């Protein structure tokens, strides 16, 4: 009789863990779907700013797609000045996105959040990147630095979807 109670106890624990895992997967899928507006083959322009003035401008190409059953978002950026490969995913335990950036100079991981319809990546307390929809159906990616209490734009990429 005691063995029956123990096995029932383990059965209930297993059932609870399976249910919890399914809920976590649903939350992760929902969070990743919020980034769906970024998916596409994008062509546009990139601008680099110094002190509010454009110092470099060129063409930009970005291919963004889901991978691993929509558990990650893969961003391939190529501009005249920069080539990046980035993986974005949502961590259920931390309840935040992570932005893994890879370039020829190395790799980094930054926390991110989805707020007001855009992905906001925090490199540090004074540097952030935004990924958001534009009014014309494209998307805009830009970076800012906090200088003397004011957010100053450092780069801007604007894209139109070719798909």
Predicted segment positions?
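Central antiparallel beta-sheet cores of small beta-barrel/beta-sandwich binding domains
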Residues: 27-29, 45-130
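N-terminal helix-cap/turn-to-beta initiation motif at the start of protein domains
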Residues: 27-43
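Bacterial Sec-dependent N-terminal signal peptides
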Residues: 1-26
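Asp-box/BNR beta-propeller blade signature and adjacent active/binding-site loops
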Residues: 60, 82, 137-140, 153
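Low-complexity, intrinsically disordered Gly/Pro/Thr-rich segments
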Residues: 135-148
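Edge beta-strand at a domain terminus
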Residues: 145-163
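A short, compositionally biased
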Residues: 40-42, 94-95, 137
């Amino acid at each position: 009789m005691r063995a029956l109670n123990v096995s029932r106890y383990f059965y209930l624990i297993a059932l609870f863990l399976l249910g919890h895992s399914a809920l976590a997967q649903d939350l992760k899928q929902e969070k990743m779907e919020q980034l769906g507006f970024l998916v596409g083959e994008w062509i546009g322009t990139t601008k680099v700013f110094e002190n509010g003035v454009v110092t470099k401008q060129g063409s930009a190409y970005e291919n963004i797609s889901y991978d691993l059953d929509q558990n990650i978002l893969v961003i391939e950026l190529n501009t005249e000045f920069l080539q990046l490969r980035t993986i974005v995913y949502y961590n259920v335990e931390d309840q935040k996105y992570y932005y893994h950036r890879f370039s020829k100079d190395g790799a980094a991981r930054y926390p991110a959040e989805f707020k007001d319809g855009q992905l906001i990546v925090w490199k540090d307390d004074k540097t952030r990147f935004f990924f958001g929809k534009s009014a014309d159906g494209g998307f805009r990616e830009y970076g800012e630095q906090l200088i003397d209490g004011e957010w100053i734009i450092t780069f801007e990429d604007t894209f139109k979807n070719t798909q």
